[in-house]
Amino acid sequence: MAFSKIDLRNFRCFDSLSIDLSCKSSLFHGKNGCGKTSILESIYVASSGRSFRTSNLESLIKKGAEAFNIRAYDDNTGSILEVNKAKTKPINIKINNSKVTISELVRAFPSFSIDSKTFFYNDNAPEYRRKQLDRGLFIASSDYSKDWFGYFRSLKQRNSALKLGDIAQAKAYDPLLVDHGERLNLLRENLITEVKEIYDEIVSKLIQENKRAD
């Protein structure tokens, strides 16, 4: 699914704003501080339930307001997405008036944020690189989320058993950790291979264009 229109209310610096996104690509321009990044942030919040700027969603509520509201529309499917975040309350997400989880939202409206950190991907901390990789795989593969949650659930239970000194119980989780871990690594390797092929193709085209320009 893709957004064709998005309406904002009490989000960041905006009292009310409606944006047409029906074109294949959109360009936002304006002076510093006018809210360009906030528009991009609102689209990301609408498609992921999270912000790429802060972990505190309450800070996105316009000063003096009690909540922010985002409504996004997909003309191709007729779907209407609504995201509400009130102070001291958890985020509330609905698709066609039915409440959904963040994982369901991400699958319905897959998106990926390319920001300043992305340009220095290899220089960033391993945790950041894993998160970016995991997000792409969560969107691309339903099996990945099953194995990801299975792996960390088994790891948590294994660590709890170790804290209690129950070595036999801890060892019982080893096969699950190995099984889920191997599948996670395979999916990650496959994604990296696919991305490398696309990257090599783009670089090859750029080299050819530069040669023609010379």
Tell what function each PLM region has.
Residues 45-48, 160:
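Regular, well-ordered alpha-helical segments
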Residues 47-128, 137-140, 144, 196-204:
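Nucleotide-state sensing region of NTPase/ATPase domains
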Residues 1-45:
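Pre-Walker A-like glycine/lysine-rich segment at the N-terminus of P-loop NTPase domains
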Residues 30-35, 49, 125, 181:
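Glycine-centered flexibility sites
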Residues 120-209:
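An accessory alpha-helical subdomain
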Residues 42-43, 110-113, 175:
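Short hydrophobic/aromatic segments of transmembrane alpha-helices and their interfaces
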Residues 36, 40-41, 57, 133-134, ...:
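Alpha-helical structural signal
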Residues 211-214:
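Pre-NBD coupling/linker segments of ABC/ABC-like ATPases
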